[in-house]
């Protein structure tokens, strides 16, 4: 299976030093789309996460993702969320993300909670942002998810910067990229 995932995260609302340097960015939402071996969408996953480190949302984060503190308070703790997500992924899967930051922050959050054993590393993944550049541009540039969506003239039915929406856009872009491009 292909698991295309996206994360949203928060940071210190004061914008100054991090209260806990081990977790500069705290994951607050996981969204994912699952494709089968025929590259057909077979399932989705979405989970809000109740913050433990940064209880208030940084202003710039709030402007972008449009989630408020009260919504996050209804979320579940990260350890439960990551277990649900990995269970949803199943036994055999390949991760796909837009860029490399989500994988890095996922591992950092799992390390913070002492949960790296749930996903033995190194974590292998495909960077759809890079694949987009290889297939449609110069192989070097890194474009925004919205740019790629517009470039491919894909319909924009949801707001960007929500985890499930961004995972869905990334999955639709991936479907425009042939498997041969992934082998390169």
Which sequence ranges carry the predicted segments?
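Entry/capping segment at the start of metal-dependent catalytic domains
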Residues: 1-38
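Short intrinsically disordered, low-complexity coil segments enriched in acidic
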Residues: 1-2, 70, 139
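Short secondary-structure capping micro-motifs at structural edges
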Residues: 19, 83-84
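Metal-dependent phosphoesterase signature
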Residues: 62-81
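Metal-dependent phosphoesterase core characteristic of DEDDh/y 3'-5' exonuclease domains
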Residues: 24-30, 34-65, 86-184
């Amino acid at each position: 299976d292909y698991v295309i995932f996206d994360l949203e995260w928060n940071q210190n609302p004061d914008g100054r030093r991090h209260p806990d340097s081990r977790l500069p960015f705290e994951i607050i939402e996981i969204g994912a789309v699952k494709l089968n071996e025929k590259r057909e969408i077979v399932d989705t996953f979405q989970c809000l996460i109740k913050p433990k480190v940064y209880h208030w949302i940084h202003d710039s984060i709030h402007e972008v993702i449009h989630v408020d503190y009260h919504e996050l308070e209804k979320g579940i703790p990260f350890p439960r969320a990551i277990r649900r997500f990995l269970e949803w992924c199943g036994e055999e899967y390949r991760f796909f993300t837009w860029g490399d930051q989500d994988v890095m922050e996922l591992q950092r959050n799992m390390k913070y909670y002492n949960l790296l054993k749930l996903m033995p590393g190194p974590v292998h993944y495909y960077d759809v942002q890079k694949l987009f550049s290889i297939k449609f541009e110069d192989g070097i540039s890194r474009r925004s998810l919205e740019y790629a969506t517009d470039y491919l003239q894909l319909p924009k039915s949801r707001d960007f910067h929500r985890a499930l929406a961004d995972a869905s856009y990334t999955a639709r872009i991936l479907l425009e990229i042939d498997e041969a491009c992934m082998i390169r």
